[in-house]
A protein has these predicted regions:
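C-terminal catalytic lobe of FAD-dependent flavoproteins
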Residues: 3-48, 53-247, 251-260
Length: 260
């Protein structure tokens, strides 16, 4: 049994209306030696993060009042038009599984990952720590570790691999109206050609749900991208849920049921 221990450190973000003009991002250096970032988000918002808040469990992470106050007060030291909690439009949180290194401060705990192989019987590789921004390097190192047990190449190959939807497209004959095309291209990339096929199967894209969300996109997300719930559609596949009205939710769920 491994002697390594994991500490759960929550990171939370807040989204506000756009705080500044331009497409540049900012990294703010704070007095506590931490940094937070401001990033343009979905054209009309600003994403602010992140925090280091140690928690006992990783179930249902949710931003705390302390985290909100920390982000708000930190940003207000750098901007002219101060923000309050009333300016927060949406929040999201996640929990980092960090390897215990006896640091007293959660922000000081190492973000590095480490491996442990037990090959007494059937070999098993355990990965401790890591974070989203290093997932590719972590995965390559993990494959390198297990390559001596199974027939798999340990050569690095993902650095130049095109991400899904990143391929060039020569199909520019879109039937999707220009008014809703920019968001779809930005969201789906090359997969817009497949989405265009779904649009053709409806009269004007099918039932209109809200803003630029139509039935054809719902059908695509269910059949092609494994969306199962309204939350999948509004937050995990798109971020349309940020300003999606609650009264429109029953209509969305009724359409969703047609394709499940």
């Amino acid at each position: 049994q491994s002697q390594k221990k994991i500490r759960h450190v929550q990171g939370s973000h807040i989204i506000t209306e756009k705080l500044y003009k331009g497409e540049q991002a900012y990294i703010l250096q704070l007095n506590d030696k931490r940094i937070i970032f401001l990033i343009p988000y979905l054209d009309k918002y600003t994403l602010i993060g992140t925090t280091d808040h140690e928690v006992k469990s990783y179930d249902s992470p949710k931003i705390t009042d302390i985290e909100k106050e920390y982000l708000i007060s930190s940003v207000n030291k750098f901007i002219k038009n101060k923000i309050t909690e009333d300016n927060i439009i949406w929040t999201y949180s996640g929990v980092r599984p960090l390897v215990e290194d006896l640091s007293e401060n959660a922000s000081k705990i190492t973000r590095d990952y480490t491996f442990e192989i037990d090959d007494k019987d059937a070999p098993i590789l355990t990965v401790f720590g890591g974070k989203l921004t290093t997932f590719r390097k972590l995965s390559e190192h993990a494959l390198d570790k297990i390559s001596k047990y199974i027939k798999i190449s340990n050569k690095s190959w993902t650095g130049n691999e095109i991400l899904p939807g990143g391929e060039k497209t020569t199909d520019l004959n879109f039937l999707i109206p220009e008014g809703i095309l920019p968001r779809l291209i930005k969201t789906y990339g090359h997969k817009i050609t497949k989405l265009n096929q779904y649009y053709q199967g409806f009269n004007d894209g099918g039932e209109h749900i809200f803003n630029d969300l139509y039935e054809f996109e719902i059908k695509y997300l269910v059949l092609e991208e494994m969306a199962k719930t309204s939350e999948d559609i509004l937050f995990r596949r798109t971020k349309l849920g940020i300003n999606f009205p609650k009264e429109k939710l029953p209509n969305l769920e009724n359409i969703l049921k047609k394709y499940l």
